[in-house]
From Swiss-Prot:
Superkingdom per UniProt: Bacteria
Pfam families reported for this sequence: Ribosomal_L16
Organism: Bordetella petrii (strain ATCC BAA-461 / DSM 12804 / CCUG 43448)
Described purpose of this protein according to its UniProt entry: Binds 23S rRNA and is also seen to make contacts with the A and possibly P site tRNAs.
Annotated gene: rplP
Lineage, broadest ranks: Bacteria, Pseudomonadati, Pseudomonadota, Betaproteobacteria, Burkholderiales
GO aspect biological process, one term: translation
Recorded GO CC terms: cytosolic large ribosomal subunit
Assembly: Part of the 50S ribosomal subunit.
Ranges annotated as biased composition (Basic residues): 1-13
Gene Ontology molecular function: rRNA binding; structural constituent of ribosome; tRNA binding
Name listed for the protein in its UniProt record: Large ribosomal subunit protein uL16
Segments traversing the membrane: none
């Protein structure tokens, strides 16, 4: 599972996920990409599940890049604990996703295979996505 090796602070405030992605909006490494059209949080488990779905479909065909990283800790209090007594402990890690962000990239496979692999991966994710291809010269 993806998570930072170390952080300056263990806990982080909730914040608001607004606006559009300004960085990581183009296919930079591979030929095809899976781009977010919705906004939300992707947990490390969801990122890994989608990666496995892609790998299973393309077998040993191509190369994959994961363009997102879960660097935000989400804390939770245990079940049936009274309010107060401080903030809960970090339970899992998420990546905040804005519309326009490229999540995964792939090369070395045909477009049909890439489309199907990304379709399977998108089913594992809680946000809406679309298939994009690299524009040569852009």
């Amino acid at each position: 599972m993806l998570q930072p090796s170390r952080r300056k602070y263990r806990k982080e405030q909730k914040g608001r996920n607004t606006g559009l992605a300004t960085r990581g909006t183009h296919v930079s490494f591979g030929e095809f990409g899976l781009k977010a059209t919705g906004r939300g949080r992707l947990t490390a488990r969801q990122i890994e599940a989608a990666r496995r779905a892609i790998n299973r479909h393309i077998k040993r065909g191509g190369r994959i890049w994961i363009r997102i990283f879960p660097d935000k800790p989400i804390s939770q209090k245990p079940a049936e604990v009274r309010m107060g007594n401080g903030k809960g402990n970090p339970e899992y890690w998420v990546a905040e996703i804005q519309p326009g962000k490229v999540l995964y990239e792939m090369e070395g496979v045909s477009e049909e295979l890439a489309r199907e692999a990304f379709r399977l991966a998108a089913a594992k994710l809680p946000i809406s996505t679309t298939f994009v291809a690299r524009h040569i010269g852009a």
